[in-house]
Each structure stands twice: as structure tokens, then as C-alpha cells.
């Protein structure tokens, strides 16, 4: 049996340092996965019938929009955690883009289809009136617009990954064009308008409500 040479103090310190970095680098990965889960949950809630829920009286579509904004928070925190722990890597960049594709690509497009189908076809309709097999041009066009948005998001994220060949996190602080979270935030903001319209629909406003509110503000 060949005896192993003793490990020097410097090598022992280096091994402990690598183990610590490997442990700490899990934090950015978990934050990125949190973004991915938010996107999946947003699609889940958007697929439900639109109406008031048990969550603060919000509609299911409003919850989906809030989850997109929560995904934006996770998307910002994972980059901050990677810079803080100096654990930026190609793996993290690719995983981040995959999570962004779901939360900021597929989820907002599906939310728009649900919102349009609700106001165009009535509360009893889902997305059946929209799609390539719809019996009207409007339904086909709206489905095509949503599909075009998803394609643009995929191309935007792929271009970002290809252009950023370096693993230096400082290079990821600059964008060309509109970042996908910004576009998704603009679409998710429509759910806030939808929530406001639902409040007006289910709670009758008195005739003099506007005058009273204006007087109070003055």
C-alpha cells in the first residue's frame, strides 16, 4: 500500500474554501429556481376560471400577475447573490435564461390569452375561442400575437447568452434592447387594471361616489 503524502496547510485551506464556495453557490441557484416556480405557478393560476379568490379577494389572473412580479424579484436577487458570493458561472446564466423563458415569456403570453378570451368570449369561455383552430380571424390573430411574443422572448434570451461569452458578472449588467422582465412586467400590469374593473363590477359605486371622492381629495 502506497502511503499518501500529507496535505499541506495551504492545500487544506484551499479544499475548505472550495467546499464553502460550492455550498454558498447553491443560494443563487435556489433563487433562480424560485423564479422558475413563480412562472409555473402563474400559468397554473391563469388557467383557472377568472373570478375572485380567497387570496385577499384578488382574481386568479391578478394572482398570476403578482407571481410574475415576484419572479422579477427572484430574478434580481439571484444575480445579486451570485455577485456577492462570487459564484457567477455559465451554468447559472443558462439556468437563469431558462427560468426567464417560463416566467417572462410563456406565462405573460398565456395570461394575455386568458384576459382577452374573458372579455371577448365571456366568463364561461377559456382559451378555446383563441388559437390557430379558432373559427374567427380575431382569435387566430391574438393567438399569433402571443406566440410571436414568446418567440421574441426566446430570441432575446438566446442573443443575450451568446453575446455574453464571459462569465464575468459585470458584463451582464448591460442590455441591448428591452429586457424580458421589463416586457413581462408591462403585460402583467394589465392584471392590475383587470382587478380594478372586477372591483367596479362586483361592488356597485354610488352615483355621488365620484363627487365625494373628489371633495375629500380637495
Where are the model-predicted features located?
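Multi-pass membrane catalytic core of lipid/isoprenoid biosynthesis enzymes
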Residues: 30, 66, 84-157
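Interhelical loop and helix-boundary elements at the membrane-water interface
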Residues: 2, 14-36, 82-101, 141, ...
Amino acid at each position: 500500500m502506497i502511503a499518501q503524502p500529507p496535505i499541506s496547510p495551504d492545500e487544506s485551506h484551499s479544499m475548505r474554501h472550495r467546499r464553502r464556495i460550492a455550498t454558498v453557490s447553491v443560494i443563487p441557484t435556489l433563487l433562480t429556481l424560485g423564479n422558475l416556480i413563480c412562472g409555473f405557478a402563474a400559468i397554473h393560476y391563469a388557467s383557472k376560471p377568472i373570478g375572485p379568490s380567497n387570496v385577499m379577494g384578488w382574481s386568479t389572473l391578478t394572482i398570476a400577475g403578482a407571481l410574475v412580479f415576484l419572479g422579477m424579484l427572484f430574478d434580481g436577487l439571484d444575480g445579486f447573490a451570485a455577485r456577492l458570493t462570487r459564484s457567477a458561472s455559465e451554468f447559472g446564466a443558462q439556468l437563469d435564461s431558462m427560468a426567464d423563458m417560463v416566467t417572462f415569456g410563456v406565462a405573460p403570453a398565456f395570461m394575455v390569452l386568458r384576459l382577452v378570451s374573458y372579455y371577448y368570449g365571456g366568463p364561461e369561455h377559456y382559451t378555446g375561442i383563441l388559437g390557430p383552430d379558432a373559427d374567427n380571424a380575431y382569435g387566430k390573430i391574438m393567438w399569433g400575437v402571443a406566440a410571436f411574443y414568446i418567440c421574441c422572448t426566446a430570441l432575446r434570451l438566446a442573443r443575450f447568452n451568446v453575446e455574453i461569452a464571459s462569465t464575468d458578472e459585470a458584463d451582464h449588467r448591460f442590455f441591448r434592447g428591452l429586457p424580458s422582465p421589463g416586457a413581462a412586467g408591462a403585460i402583467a400590469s394589465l392584471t392590475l387594471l383587470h382587478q380594478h374593473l372586477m372591483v367596479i363590477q362586483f361592488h356597485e359605486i354610488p352615483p355621488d361616489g365620484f363627487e365625494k371622492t373628489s371633495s375629500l381629495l380637495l
